[in-house]
């Protein structure tokens, strides 16, 4: 990975967008294409569906997608919290089960909090 430059990423992604972006695609279809090509979360490890890019290269992917004015990849807590945690600490079975549906936008995750004594303590109901 260390030999890849932001210029390389830009050139590859721009070429890929030229061949794959279609404004008539549904968001689901587009996100599937992004996931299949490993552009939906390029900082994720390769074995978890990403490209294993560092911050600079992953940031370049976001920049190129924005400049191309295409629909961006899925976002949210699943992508920011769940997928990275599962990629590092999950079993191979958990990685295979949960990460693809997070990266292709099929499933959205949320984070819930319980505040004992404040009315949201579900265990205390």
Q: What residue spans do the PLM features occupy?
A:
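Alpha-helix boundary/capping detector
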Residues: 43, 87, 91, 124-125
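Internal, well-ordered alpha-helical segments in soluble enzyme and binding-protein domains
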Residues: 82, 94-98, 125
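Amphipathic, small/basic residue-rich leader segments at the start of a protein or domain
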Residues: 1-76, 94-104, 108, 117
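N-terminal glycine-rich flavin-associated loop
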Residues: 74-93, 119
């Amino acid at each position: 990975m260390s030999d890849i430059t932001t210029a390389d990423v830009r050139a590859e992604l721009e070429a890929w967008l030229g061949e794959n972006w279609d404004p008539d695609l549904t968001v689901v279809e587009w996100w599937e294409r992004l996931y299949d090509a490993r552009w939906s979360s390029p900082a994720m490890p390769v074995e978890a569906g990403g490209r294993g890019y560092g911050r600079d290269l992953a940031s370049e992917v976001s920049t190129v997608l924005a400049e191309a004015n295409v629909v961006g990849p899925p976002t949210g807590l699943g992508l920011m919290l769940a997928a990275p945690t599962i990629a590092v600490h999950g079993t191979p079975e958990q990685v295979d089960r949960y990460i693809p549906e997070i990266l292709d936008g099929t499933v959205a995750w949320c984070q819930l909090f319980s505040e004992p004594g404040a009315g949201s303590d579900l265990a205390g109901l």
